[in-house]
């Protein structure tokens, strides 16, 4: 996510305004302040170039609330902003992670605004166990193609542990005018399904934006101290224009022992039909130690082996990426 620098005064003003709004709203609704600070010290290498430094891992804070309207109806809202925990720089747009209002009841839930695609949460995010799919060990191979802004969505009620959500991201381009940045005259469409059957959890996600699309299936199984998950995905033109189709797969596993967690995560992306040498493999070994329910210290080693035309995580075609990291994460 791109960021721009904001002055301390501007950031303080924005935060204070949000806090005052939340305080005023609490008189008539249930409002919660929440967030996460997640920071690592890492030694990274891209090809033969290396660096050691402090890195942010999708730190964020937000406000969410709900008001009971009576008759089974509830109105809710969510505002969530990312920030760089290593520098303090705020994300732009400020509430890029989430800014929505929703109406819910026995009929389900209607959502309006901006949020991260539910197809992603139903598949790739669900099986990324060691560091919440953030930072340098995040899933570099998953094809995320959704337009996050200007969305209208409907989520069904829970039917025997099954839910379905569909959304449309409106392009908002005025007819007869040239396309502006981010307004290409095409709506985006996103679908997500989740189902639980005892220890087995299944999910699916589909997204389409003009000539780019993806479809993924996920399974996750928990038995005793063992966790095992994985997904398969087929996308078209997600990383290369006119690249054709590509298949990818990821497996993750964890063993829980008291306050300790041992993690392994392996992903493989095939080459696009029209881009020879665009295949890649990613693997991560990690260890987490939970100091409390909200705080953990952790370490991991992650590596992405890129084909000659692939630049996953490295940003340089043909260059491999690797990182050795230790970090602290605190939820509030």
Enumerate the language-model features and the residues they cover.
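Structural signature of outer-membrane beta-barrel channels/translocons
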Residues: 20, 64-68, 104-106, 155-158, ...
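Outer-membrane beta-barrel "beta-signal"
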Residues: 191, 289, 303, 319-332
């Amino acid at each position: 996510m791109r960021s721009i620098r904001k002055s301390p005064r501007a950031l303080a003003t924005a935060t204070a305004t949000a806090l005052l709004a939340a305080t005023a709203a609490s008189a008539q609704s249930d409002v919660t302040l929440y967030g996460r600070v997640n920071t690592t010290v890492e030694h990274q290498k891209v090809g033969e170039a290396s660096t050691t430094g402090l890195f942010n891992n999708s730190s964020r804070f937000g406000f969410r609330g709900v008001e009971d309207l009576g008759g089974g109806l509830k109105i809710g809202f969510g505002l969530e902003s990312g920030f760089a925990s290593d520098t303090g720089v705020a994300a732009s747009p400020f509430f890029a992670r989430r800014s929505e209002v929703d109406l819910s009841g026995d009929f389900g839930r209607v959502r309006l605004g901006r949020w991260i695609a539910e197809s992603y949460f139903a598949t790739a995010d669900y099986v990324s166990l060691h560091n919440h799919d953030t930072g340098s060990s995040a899933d570099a191979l998953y094809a995320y193609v959704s337009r996050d802004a200007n969305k209208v969505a409907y989520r069904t009620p829970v039917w025997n542990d099954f839910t379905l959500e569909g959304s449309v991201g409106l392009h908002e381009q005025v007819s007869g005018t040239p396309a502006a940045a981010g307004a290409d005259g095409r709506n985006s469409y996103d679908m997500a399904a989740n189902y639980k059957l005892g220890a087995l959890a299944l999910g699916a996600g589909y997204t389409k934006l003009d000539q780019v699309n993806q479809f993924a299936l996920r399974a996750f199984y928990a038995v005793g101290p063992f966790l095992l998950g994985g997904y398969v995905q087929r996308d078209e033109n997600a990383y290369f224009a006119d690249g054709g189709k590509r298949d990818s797969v990821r497996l993750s596993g964890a063993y829980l022992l008291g306050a300790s967690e041992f993690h392994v995560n392996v992903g493989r992306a095939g080459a696009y039909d029209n881009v020879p040498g665009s295949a890649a493999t990613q693997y991560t070994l990690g260890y987490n130690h939970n100091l409390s329910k909200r705080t953990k210290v952790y370490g991991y080693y992650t590596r992405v082996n890129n084909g000659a035309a692939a630049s996953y995580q490295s940003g340089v075609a043909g260059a491999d990426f690797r990182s050795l990291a230790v970090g602290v994460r605190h939820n509030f």
